[in-house]
Amino acid sequence: MLTGQEWPATPPPAVRPWLGPAALAGALGVAALTALTLSRQPPPYGFELGVGLAFLAVIGLTVVRIEAAAFIALALLGVIVVDPAPADFVFLVVIAVALVTGRFRASAPPGALVALGGFLAVSLLSAVEVVDHRVAAVYLGISIYLTIAALWLSGFVDSRRRARIVVAGYLTAAVTAAAVGVVAVLAPVPGKELFAASGRATALFQDPNVFGPFLVPTVLILLEDMLNPRLFRMRSLWKAALVGVLVLGVVFSYSRGAWLNLVVGVAVVLTVLALRRGGGRNVVRVAVLACLVTLLVVYVLAATGSTDFLFERARYQEYDSGRFAGQVVGIESAERYPLGIGPGQFESYASISAHSTYVRALAEQGLPGLILIAALLVSTVAAAVTNAVAGRETYGIGSAALLGALCGILVNSVVIDTLHWRHLWIVIALIWAGWARRRMLRRPPAPVAVAR
Protein backbone atom coordinates (compact mmCIF):
# COMPACT_ATOMS: atom_id res chain seq x y z
CA MET A 1 0.00 0.00 0.00
CA LEU A 2 1.27 3.44 -0.95
CA THR A 3 -0.81 5.58 1.38
CA GLY A 4 1.12 8.55 2.73
CA GLN A 5 4.09 8.00 0.42
CA GLU A 6 5.67 11.08 -1.15
CA TRP A 7 5.46 10.58 -4.88
CA PRO A 8 8.31 11.59 -7.15
CA ALA A 9 7.84 14.25 -9.78
CA THR A 10 6.24 12.94 -12.94
CA PRO A 11 6.54 14.11 -16.53
CA PRO A 12 3.60 15.97 -18.05
CA PRO A 13 0.80 13.89 -19.59
CA ALA A 14 1.24 12.77 -23.15
CA VAL A 15 -0.36 15.10 -25.68
CA ARG A 16 -2.96 13.60 -27.96
CA PRO A 17 -2.46 15.38 -31.31
CA TRP A 18 -6.17 15.58 -32.12
CA LEU A 19 -7.17 17.19 -28.83
CA GLY A 20 -5.70 20.60 -29.65
CA PRO A 21 -7.60 21.15 -32.93
CA ALA A 22 -10.78 19.69 -31.41
CA ALA A 23 -10.55 21.97 -28.40
CA LEU A 24 -9.80 24.98 -30.63
CA ALA A 25 -12.83 24.25 -32.80
CA GLY A 26 -15.01 23.87 -29.72
CA ALA A 27 -13.67 27.08 -28.17
CA LEU A 28 -14.36 29.03 -31.37
CA GLY A 29 -17.89 27.63 -31.44
CA VAL A 30 -18.51 28.64 -27.84
CA ALA A 31 -17.10 32.12 -28.50
CA ALA A 32 -19.39 32.51 -31.51
CA LEU A 33 -22.43 31.49 -29.46
CA THR A 34 -21.46 33.93 -26.70
CA ALA A 35 -21.12 36.74 -29.24
CA LEU A 36 -24.51 35.82 -30.74
CA THR A 37 -26.16 35.90 -27.32
CA LEU A 38 -24.64 39.29 -26.45
CA SER A 39 -25.59 40.73 -29.84
CA ARG A 40 -29.26 39.97 -29.17
CA GLN A 41 -29.10 41.79 -25.82
CA PRO A 42 -26.27 44.32 -26.14
CA PRO A 43 -25.02 45.68 -22.79
CA PRO A 44 -24.37 49.40 -22.11
CA TYR A 45 -21.28 51.00 -23.66
CA GLY A 46 -19.57 51.51 -20.31
CA PHE A 47 -20.03 47.86 -19.49
CA GLU A 48 -18.57 46.86 -22.85
CA LEU A 49 -15.54 49.09 -22.26
CA GLY A 50 -14.96 47.63 -18.79
CA VAL A 51 -15.27 44.07 -20.06
CA GLY A 52 -12.88 44.84 -22.92
CA LEU A 53 -10.22 46.22 -20.58
CA ALA A 54 -10.65 43.27 -18.21
CA PHE A 55 -10.38 40.92 -21.19
CA LEU A 56 -7.05 42.45 -22.24
CA ALA A 57 -5.77 42.32 -18.65
CA VAL A 58 -6.66 38.63 -18.35
CA ILE A 59 -4.92 37.86 -21.66
CA GLY A 60 -1.77 39.59 -20.48
CA LEU A 61 -1.85 37.86 -17.10
CA THR A 62 -2.43 34.46 -18.72
CA VAL A 63 0.52 34.86 -21.07
CA VAL A 64 2.83 35.84 -18.20
CA ARG A 65 1.41 33.73 -15.32
CA ILE A 66 -1.13 31.15 -16.37
CA GLU A 67 -1.30 29.81 -12.80
CA ALA A 68 -2.46 33.21 -11.50
CA ALA A 69 -5.12 33.42 -14.20
CA ALA A 70 -6.32 29.91 -13.34
CA PHE A 71 -6.59 30.88 -9.66
CA ILE A 72 -8.69 33.94 -10.56
CA ALA A 73 -11.00 31.85 -12.75
CA LEU A 74 -11.58 29.37 -9.94
CA ALA A 75 -11.97 32.09 -7.29
CA LEU A 76 -14.73 33.64 -9.42
CA LEU A 77 -16.75 30.41 -9.45
CA GLY A 78 -18.88 31.77 -6.60
CA VAL A 79 -20.24 34.57 -8.81
CA ILE A 80 -22.94 32.90 -10.90
CA VAL A 81 -25.65 35.55 -10.96
CA VAL A 82 -25.40 35.83 -14.75
CA ASP A 83 -24.65 33.44 -17.60
CA PRO A 84 -22.02 33.37 -18.95
CA ALA A 85 -20.43 33.98 -15.56
CA PRO A 86 -17.21 36.00 -15.05
CA ALA A 87 -15.34 32.75 -14.39
CA ASP A 88 -16.37 31.46 -17.82
CA PHE A 89 -14.79 34.42 -19.61
CA VAL A 90 -11.53 33.95 -17.70
CA PHE A 91 -11.53 30.20 -18.38
CA LEU A 92 -12.10 30.82 -22.10
CA VAL A 93 -9.15 33.23 -22.22
CA VAL A 94 -6.91 30.81 -20.31
CA ILE A 95 -7.86 27.90 -22.57
CA ALA A 96 -7.41 29.97 -25.74
CA VAL A 97 -3.95 31.16 -24.63
CA ALA A 98 -3.02 27.58 -23.69
CA LEU A 99 -4.03 26.42 -27.17
CA VAL A 100 -2.15 29.18 -28.99
CA THR A 101 1.02 28.78 -26.90
CA GLY A 102 1.04 24.99 -27.04
CA ARG A 103 0.31 24.57 -23.33
CA PHE A 104 -2.98 22.70 -23.75
CA ARG A 105 -2.52 19.16 -22.44
CA ALA A 106 -5.28 16.76 -21.54
CA SER A 107 -5.44 13.47 -19.69
CA ALA A 108 -8.43 11.18 -19.35
CA PRO A 109 -9.13 7.45 -19.31
CA PRO A 110 -9.66 6.23 -22.89
CA GLY A 111 -13.12 4.93 -22.04
CA ALA A 112 -14.14 8.32 -20.68
CA LEU A 113 -12.81 10.12 -23.76
CA VAL A 114 -14.66 7.81 -26.15
CA ALA A 115 -17.90 8.11 -24.16
CA LEU A 116 -17.55 11.89 -23.94
CA GLY A 117 -16.92 12.26 -27.66
CA GLY A 118 -19.80 9.92 -28.42
CA PHE A 119 -22.17 11.84 -26.16
CA LEU A 120 -21.34 15.15 -27.84
CA ALA A 121 -21.75 13.54 -31.27
CA VAL A 122 -25.17 12.14 -30.31
CA SER A 123 -26.13 15.56 -28.93
CA LEU A 124 -25.18 17.16 -32.24
CA LEU A 125 -27.15 14.55 -34.17
CA SER A 126 -30.24 15.03 -32.03
CA ALA A 127 -30.02 18.81 -32.54
CA VAL A 128 -30.74 18.56 -36.28
CA GLU A 129 -34.52 18.79 -35.82
CA VAL A 130 -35.47 20.66 -32.67
CA VAL A 131 -38.22 23.04 -31.58
CA ASP A 132 -35.86 25.86 -30.59
CA HIS A 133 -32.56 25.92 -32.50
CA ARG A 134 -31.14 28.82 -30.49
CA VAL A 135 -31.67 27.02 -27.16
CA ALA A 136 -30.18 23.84 -28.63
CA ALA A 137 -27.09 25.70 -29.89
CA VAL A 138 -26.52 27.45 -26.55
CA TYR A 139 -27.05 24.27 -24.53
CA LEU A 140 -24.71 22.24 -26.74
CA GLY A 141 -22.17 25.07 -26.67
CA ILE A 142 -22.14 25.04 -22.86
CA SER A 143 -21.61 21.27 -22.88
CA ILE A 144 -18.66 21.63 -25.27
CA TYR A 145 -17.17 24.46 -23.22
CA LEU A 146 -17.34 22.48 -19.96
CA THR A 147 -15.82 19.47 -21.71
CA ILE A 148 -12.90 21.54 -22.99
CA ALA A 149 -12.43 23.16 -19.58
CA ALA A 150 -12.31 19.75 -17.88
CA LEU A 151 -9.80 18.42 -20.41
CA TRP A 152 -7.59 21.48 -19.97
CA LEU A 153 -7.75 21.31 -16.17
CA SER A 154 -6.87 17.59 -16.19
CA GLY A 155 -3.61 18.43 -17.96
CA PHE A 156 -2.96 21.66 -16.08
CA VAL A 157 -2.81 19.89 -12.71
CA ASP A 158 0.58 18.21 -13.16
CA SER A 159 2.30 19.19 -9.90
CA ARG A 160 1.54 19.69 -6.22
CA ARG A 161 1.95 23.45 -6.66
CA ARG A 162 -0.71 23.60 -9.37
CA ALA A 163 -3.02 21.30 -7.43
CA ARG A 164 -2.72 23.67 -4.47
CA ILE A 165 -3.52 26.64 -6.73
CA VAL A 166 -6.65 24.94 -8.08
CA VAL A 167 -7.99 23.92 -4.68
CA ALA A 168 -7.09 27.29 -3.15
CA GLY A 169 -9.07 29.07 -5.87
CA TYR A 170 -12.06 26.78 -5.46
CA LEU A 171 -11.84 27.05 -1.67
CA THR A 172 -11.72 30.85 -1.86
CA ALA A 173 -14.93 30.88 -3.90
CA ALA A 174 -16.67 28.33 -1.66
CA VAL A 175 -15.78 29.85 1.72
CA THR A 176 -16.63 33.37 0.55
CA ALA A 177 -19.96 32.22 -0.87
CA ALA A 178 -20.78 30.20 2.26
CA ALA A 179 -19.97 33.12 4.58
CA VAL A 180 -22.02 35.57 2.51
CA GLY A 181 -24.97 33.17 2.33
CA VAL A 182 -24.98 32.35 6.04
CA VAL A 183 -24.71 36.01 7.09
CA ALA A 184 -27.52 36.94 4.69
CA VAL A 185 -29.79 34.30 6.24
CA LEU A 186 -29.00 35.07 9.88
CA ALA A 187 -28.33 38.82 9.98
CA PRO A 188 -30.55 41.76 8.93
CA VAL A 189 -27.99 43.10 6.46
CA PRO A 190 -28.97 45.53 3.67
CA GLY A 191 -29.86 43.80 0.42
CA LYS A 192 -30.02 40.38 2.06
CA GLU A 193 -32.67 39.27 -0.45
CA LEU A 194 -29.92 39.29 -3.08
CA PHE A 195 -27.98 36.63 -1.17
CA ALA A 196 -30.79 34.69 0.54
CA ALA A 197 -33.83 34.14 -1.67
CA SER A 198 -36.96 33.11 0.28
CA GLY A 199 -34.90 32.61 3.42
CA ARG A 200 -32.49 30.18 1.72
CA ALA A 201 -28.80 30.98 1.31
CA THR A 202 -27.82 31.53 -2.32
CA ALA A 203 -24.90 34.02 -2.04
CA LEU A 204 -24.20 35.02 -5.66
CA PHE A 205 -25.78 31.88 -7.14
CA GLN A 206 -29.10 31.82 -8.95
CA ASP A 207 -30.35 28.67 -7.22
CA PRO A 208 -29.81 27.43 -3.63
CA ASN A 209 -29.98 23.88 -4.98
CA VAL A 210 -26.76 24.60 -6.88
CA PHE A 211 -25.14 26.77 -4.20
CA GLY A 212 -25.34 24.05 -1.52
CA PRO A 213 -23.79 21.22 -3.57
CA PHE A 214 -21.07 23.60 -4.81
CA LEU A 215 -19.68 23.70 -1.25
CA VAL A 216 -19.59 19.93 -0.66
CA PRO A 217 -16.36 18.97 -2.54
CA THR A 218 -14.36 21.55 -0.57
CA VAL A 219 -15.70 20.14 2.71
CA LEU A 220 -14.49 16.67 1.74
CA ILE A 221 -11.09 17.86 0.47
CA LEU A 222 -10.44 19.77 3.70
CA LEU A 223 -11.67 16.81 5.75
CA GLU A 224 -9.16 14.40 4.22
CA ASP A 225 -6.40 17.00 4.30
CA MET A 226 -6.95 17.38 8.05
CA LEU A 227 -6.30 13.66 8.52
CA ASN A 228 -3.44 13.41 6.01
CA PRO A 229 -1.97 16.91 5.53
CA ARG A 230 -0.47 17.01 2.05
CA LEU A 231 -1.99 20.04 0.37
CA PHE A 232 -2.18 22.91 2.87
CA ARG A 233 0.16 23.72 5.74
CA MET A 234 -2.44 25.56 7.82
CA ARG A 235 -3.27 24.21 11.27
CA SER A 236 -6.03 21.63 11.64
CA LEU A 237 -7.98 24.11 13.79
CA TRP A 238 -8.20 26.53 10.86
CA LYS A 239 -9.24 23.74 8.52
CA ALA A 240 -11.93 22.68 11.01
CA ALA A 241 -13.18 26.29 11.18
CA LEU A 242 -13.43 26.43 7.38
CA VAL A 243 -15.29 23.11 7.37
CA GLY A 244 -17.73 24.57 9.90
CA VAL A 245 -18.42 27.62 7.72
CA LEU A 246 -18.90 25.45 4.63
CA VAL A 247 -21.23 23.01 6.39
CA LEU A 248 -23.32 25.91 7.69
CA GLY A 249 -23.57 27.11 4.10
CA VAL A 250 -24.82 23.69 3.01
CA VAL A 251 -27.35 23.57 5.86
CA PHE A 252 -28.69 27.08 5.26
CA SER A 253 -29.13 26.45 1.56
CA TYR A 254 -32.04 24.33 2.81
CA SER A 255 -31.47 22.07 -0.17
CA ARG A 256 -32.34 18.45 0.54
CA GLY A 257 -30.24 17.41 -2.44
CA ALA A 258 -27.23 19.25 -0.99
CA TRP A 259 -27.75 17.59 2.41
CA LEU A 260 -27.91 14.16 0.76
CA ASN A 261 -24.88 15.04 -1.35
CA LEU A 262 -22.87 15.88 1.78
CA VAL A 263 -24.00 12.78 3.69
CA VAL A 264 -23.11 10.48 0.79
CA GLY A 265 -19.74 12.18 0.31
CA VAL A 266 -18.79 11.91 3.99
CA ALA A 267 -19.95 8.28 4.10
CA VAL A 268 -17.76 7.41 1.10
CA VAL A 269 -14.74 9.19 2.62
CA LEU A 270 -15.24 7.36 5.93
CA THR A 271 -15.56 4.00 4.16
CA VAL A 272 -12.37 4.52 2.15
CA LEU A 273 -10.41 5.74 5.17
CA ALA A 274 -11.60 2.76 7.22
CA LEU A 275 -10.17 0.39 4.60
CA ARG A 276 -6.74 1.99 4.69
CA ARG A 277 -3.90 1.34 7.08
CA GLY A 278 -4.65 2.98 10.42
CA GLY A 279 -8.21 3.54 9.25
CA GLY A 280 -9.79 3.05 12.66
CA ARG A 281 -7.95 6.05 14.08
CA ASN A 282 -8.95 8.23 11.13
CA VAL A 283 -12.59 7.21 11.38
CA VAL A 284 -12.64 8.16 15.06
CA ARG A 285 -11.13 11.56 14.28
CA VAL A 286 -13.69 12.19 11.54
CA ALA A 287 -16.51 11.08 13.84
CA VAL A 288 -15.34 13.50 16.54
CA LEU A 289 -15.14 16.35 14.03
CA ALA A 290 -18.59 15.44 12.67
CA CYS A 291 -20.03 15.57 16.19
CA LEU A 292 -18.46 18.98 16.82
CA VAL A 293 -19.76 20.38 13.53
CA THR A 294 -23.21 18.92 14.25
CA LEU A 295 -23.24 20.60 17.66
CA LEU A 296 -22.26 23.88 16.00
CA VAL A 297 -25.08 23.56 13.46
CA VAL A 298 -27.64 22.66 16.15
CA TYR A 299 -26.54 25.61 18.28
CA VAL A 300 -26.79 28.07 15.39
CA LEU A 301 -30.19 26.71 14.35
CA ALA A 302 -31.54 26.95 17.90
CA ALA A 303 -30.04 30.38 18.56
CA THR A 304 -31.49 31.86 15.37
CA GLY A 305 -34.89 30.14 15.52
CA SER A 306 -34.31 28.38 12.21
CA THR A 307 -35.23 24.89 13.41
CA ASP A 308 -38.86 25.04 12.28
CA PHE A 309 -37.92 26.11 8.76
CA LEU A 310 -35.32 23.33 8.62
CA PHE A 311 -37.89 20.65 9.46
CA GLU A 312 -40.37 22.21 7.07
CA ARG A 313 -37.83 22.01 4.24
CA ALA A 314 -36.96 18.42 5.15
CA ARG A 315 -40.56 17.30 4.62
CA TYR A 316 -42.15 16.33 1.33
CA GLN A 317 -43.01 19.49 -0.62
CA GLU A 318 -46.04 20.03 -2.82
CA TYR A 319 -43.89 20.75 -5.87
CA ASP A 320 -42.14 17.38 -5.51
CA SER A 321 -45.05 15.71 -7.29
CA GLY A 322 -44.47 18.08 -10.22
CA ARG A 323 -40.79 17.12 -10.30
CA PHE A 324 -41.60 13.42 -10.53
CA ALA A 325 -44.26 14.14 -13.14
CA GLY A 326 -41.62 15.90 -15.22
CA GLN A 327 -39.38 12.85 -15.00
CA VAL A 328 -42.26 10.66 -16.19
CA VAL A 329 -42.73 12.99 -19.17
CA GLY A 330 -39.03 12.62 -19.96
CA ILE A 331 -39.20 8.84 -19.95
CA GLU A 332 -42.31 8.87 -22.14
CA SER A 333 -40.69 11.25 -24.65
CA ALA A 334 -37.76 8.83 -24.98
CA GLU A 335 -40.20 6.18 -26.16
CA ARG A 336 -41.54 8.50 -28.89
CA TYR A 337 -38.15 9.92 -29.93
CA PRO A 338 -35.49 7.16 -29.77
CA LEU A 339 -32.68 9.56 -30.74
CA GLY A 340 -33.88 12.25 -28.36
CA ILE A 341 -35.63 15.60 -28.68
CA GLY A 342 -32.37 17.56 -28.82
CA PRO A 343 -30.14 19.37 -26.31
CA GLY A 344 -31.93 21.84 -24.05
CA GLN A 345 -35.35 20.97 -25.46
CA PHE A 346 -36.88 19.29 -22.40
CA GLU A 347 -38.67 22.44 -21.23
CA SER A 348 -40.22 22.83 -24.70
CA TYR A 349 -41.96 19.47 -24.31
CA ALA A 350 -42.76 19.61 -20.60
CA SER A 351 -43.99 22.42 -18.38
CA ILE A 352 -41.24 21.73 -15.84
CA SER A 353 -37.52 21.02 -15.86
CA ALA A 354 -36.24 17.45 -15.98
CA HIS A 355 -34.87 17.61 -12.41
CA SER A 356 -32.61 14.66 -13.20
CA THR A 357 -29.42 14.43 -15.22
CA TYR A 358 -30.25 10.89 -16.28
CA VAL A 359 -33.83 11.66 -17.34
CA ARG A 360 -32.66 14.71 -19.30
CA ALA A 361 -30.01 12.66 -21.11
CA LEU A 362 -32.57 9.96 -21.91
CA ALA A 363 -35.12 12.47 -23.19
CA GLU A 364 -32.78 14.78 -25.11
CA GLN A 365 -30.18 12.34 -26.48
CA GLY A 366 -32.23 9.15 -26.36
CA LEU A 367 -31.07 5.79 -25.04
CA PRO A 368 -27.66 6.10 -26.79
CA GLY A 369 -27.06 9.38 -24.95
CA LEU A 370 -27.98 7.90 -21.58
CA ILE A 371 -25.68 4.91 -22.17
CA LEU A 372 -22.79 7.17 -23.19
CA ILE A 373 -23.13 9.59 -20.27
CA ALA A 374 -23.37 6.58 -17.94
CA ALA A 375 -20.21 5.12 -19.51
CA LEU A 376 -18.41 8.44 -18.99
CA LEU A 377 -19.39 8.57 -15.32
CA VAL A 378 -18.72 4.88 -14.65
CA SER A 379 -15.23 5.03 -16.19
CA THR A 380 -14.46 8.13 -14.11
CA VAL A 381 -15.78 6.48 -10.94
CA ALA A 382 -13.63 3.43 -11.72
CA ALA A 383 -10.53 5.63 -11.96
CA ALA A 384 -11.48 7.36 -8.70
CA VAL A 385 -12.04 4.04 -6.90
CA THR A 386 -8.68 2.69 -8.09
CA ASN A 387 -6.88 5.76 -6.78
CA ALA A 388 -8.83 5.85 -3.50
CA VAL A 389 -8.33 2.19 -2.62
CA ALA A 390 -4.59 2.42 -3.31
CA GLY A 391 -4.31 5.72 -1.45
CA ARG A 392 -2.95 7.61 -4.47
CA GLU A 393 -3.72 11.30 -4.20
CA THR A 394 -3.93 13.78 -7.07
CA TYR A 395 -0.76 15.73 -6.30
CA GLY A 396 -1.87 16.17 -2.69
CA ILE A 397 -5.64 16.30 -3.26
CA GLY A 398 -7.13 13.37 -1.34
CA SER A 399 -8.42 10.58 -3.56
CA ALA A 400 -11.07 9.57 -1.00
CA ALA A 401 -12.40 13.14 -1.05
CA LEU A 402 -12.60 13.19 -4.86
CA LEU A 403 -14.40 9.84 -4.93
CA GLY A 404 -16.81 11.03 -2.23
CA ALA A 405 -17.44 14.30 -4.07
CA LEU A 406 -18.22 12.51 -7.33
CA CYS A 407 -20.48 9.94 -5.65
CA GLY A 408 -22.36 12.70 -3.85
CA ILE A 409 -22.97 14.57 -7.10
CA LEU A 410 -24.08 11.40 -8.90
CA VAL A 411 -26.68 10.70 -6.21
CA ASN A 412 -27.73 14.36 -6.29
CA SER A 413 -28.12 13.99 -10.07
CA VAL A 414 -31.15 11.77 -9.57
CA VAL A 415 -33.23 14.77 -8.44
CA ILE A 416 -31.58 17.69 -10.26
CA ASP A 417 -29.88 18.35 -13.58
CA THR A 418 -26.13 18.56 -12.87
CA LEU A 419 -24.65 18.22 -16.37
CA HIS A 420 -23.80 21.94 -16.52
CA TRP A 421 -22.53 22.26 -12.95
CA ARG A 422 -19.05 23.69 -13.22
CA HIS A 423 -17.84 21.97 -10.06
CA LEU A 424 -18.91 18.55 -11.42
CA TRP A 425 -16.42 18.96 -14.26
CA ILE A 426 -13.75 20.25 -11.88
CA VAL A 427 -14.08 17.09 -9.78
CA ILE A 428 -13.99 14.94 -12.92
CA ALA A 429 -10.89 16.76 -14.18
CA LEU A 430 -9.05 16.27 -10.88
CA ILE A 431 -9.86 12.55 -10.94
CA TRP A 432 -8.55 12.34 -14.50
CA ALA A 433 -5.36 14.13 -13.42
CA GLY A 434 -4.90 11.53 -10.67
CA TRP A 435 -5.46 8.75 -13.19
CA ALA A 436 -2.79 10.26 -15.48
CA ARG A 437 -0.32 10.44 -12.61
CA ARG A 438 -0.80 6.77 -11.79
CA ARG A 439 -0.29 5.94 -15.47
CA MET A 440 2.94 7.96 -15.60
CA LEU A 441 4.28 6.27 -12.48
CA ARG A 442 3.81 2.88 -14.12
CA ARG A 443 6.03 3.80 -17.05
CA PRO A 444 9.64 2.65 -16.80
CA PRO A 445 12.17 5.48 -16.53
CA ALA A 446 13.80 6.62 -19.73
CA PRO A 447 17.33 5.22 -20.26
CA VAL A 448 20.11 7.63 -19.40
CA ALA A 449 22.89 7.97 -21.95
CA VAL A 450 26.35 7.51 -20.51
CA ALA A 451 29.00 9.83 -21.90
CA ARG A 452 32.22 8.17 -23.00
Q: What is the role of each PLM region?
A:
Residues 29-31, 95-98, 402-410, 417-452:
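Transmembrane alpha-helices of multi-pass inner-membrane enzymes
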Residues 271, 367-409, 435-436:
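Hydrophobic transmembrane alpha-helices and their immediate junctions
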